[in-house]
Amino acid sequence: MIKNMDVTVYNRKYDETTHFDTWSRTVLHGVHVYVDHKTAVSDNGLNSAEVYKIRIPADIPEADQYLPPEEYACCGGFGNWTIQNGDQIVLGECYQEIEKPADLKKLFQRHCKVTSWSDNRFGTLPHWRVGGE
């Protein structure tokens, strides 16, 4: 797998005390990112969108801090990360704390919302596959 980029994952976690979502970030080094530029013609004209395909190798330095979403929701904390629908991924390293995803729109052009993911840590090329828009 060609490793062409670092990414920053912003994980959402519900805070039962404040009743708000909190966001924690983790920089992942050495992942593969591919951006597909889709266009479609509709009654409203030409629509375009970027579709992100991200593969995170299981041998990255941060792999040991990964928790499945269920464990992250109850036990995850500082230093852990996960992948779940609704998380945000920024292309490159980002050290900005956020309170909501809209904060990223003010700072970065290249980020996506996780819309699908799978844990493929088996076989000859173990990795996590992430889809986003």
State what each model feature region is.
Residues D21-E133:
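Short, conserved turn/kink motifs that form compact alpha/beta structural patches or helix kinks used as
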